[in-house]
Amino acid sequence: MPDDLTGKQRRHLRALGHHLDALVQIGHEGITDALAAHASEQLRRHELIKVRVLESAPLDRREAAEELSARTGAALAQVLGRTFLLYLRDTEKPRIELP
């Protein structure tokens, strides 16, 4: 799933994610199993989440985005500054309708 979003779908997700607050923060410990589990839970609840990479994080923002995307099975919709958006469609009850 991580790379099957079209440009139009990414644009739609970026618009929806603009007003979101970061639900997950990556700090000095980097991406731990607990953080990945928390991100997965938030994706199940919301489908689209914003993640912030703190300055103390040992990973580059792009590396962090790609690693968390791979560990959660989510699509990377956007990387902007120290934040990025992850999207994982709920197969049972989708809340976000993609174009």
PLM feature segments, named:
Residues 1-99:
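Positively charged, polar, low-complexity stretches
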